[in-house]
Amino acid sequence: MRKVLITGGSSGLGKRIAQIWSQKGHQCHIVGRNEFHLKETLQSLSVAKGQQHTLTIADVQSDMKNLKSIFESVEIDTVVHAAGVLQSSLCVRTSEKEIDSIICTNLVSAIKLSKMAILEWFRNKNSERDRLILNISSRLSTYALPGTSVYAASKAGLESFTKVLAAEVASKGIRVNAISPGYVDTPMLSSQIRAIAEKKVPIGRLASTDEIVDACTFLLDNRYTTGTILPITGGL
């Protein structure tokens, strides 16, 4: 049984990862800002293997102390950074507050959370558990779609961080990977981008969250994979 911390666990991809992985017998500790939706997610998780799932109400931009408390109470071995903020305006029309929110949520919080996890794992170096950091990136990190420049920058940074961090900690038995999904059918996707996506994707449709979770599960289970950015794009 893995013990997994999942940010962005109240909706979308983070929620679906928690649901499917709980069905596989893993214990999930979900983090998000919306208490109602977190409780809804928690109630939907399987406990067939006796898992003790938890929720933590926290904003990854500012509540690192709340996240640290999870590591202090549970021997977390997997961290999934699924929290994210999208952008749907040109850079010149994006406020400084929005820019800070996008960069902090999508990139800076992932860096801080990864550092926190690694330091905790260093303190417990005798553990034989496989340890994994899994970041949720985006095809938009390299696909030039007007109106997503700040978001794209945050995800490009996240992918570079993933690759270099993987090289830094591989010898310590810690794996770091990311998935790079194309357009996924989640509440996060605006109607404007949804319409563009359905025309642009060669396969002709949006990805389901379950298809993206399948890729996450591969990176979870394959212990020889690290420093990998796995694209799931429908040919985009």
Swiss-Prot record:
Belongs to the short-chain dehydrogenases/reductases (SDR) family. The keyword Protein biosynthesis does not apply. This is 3-oxoacyl-[acyl-carrier-protein] reductase. Its EC number is 1.1.1.100. It is found in: Mitochondrion. The active site is at residues 137, 151, 155. It holds the Pfam family adh_short_C2. The keyword NADP applies. InterPro entries: NAD(P)-bd_dom_sf, Sc_DH/Rdtase_CS, SDR_fam. The gene is oar2.
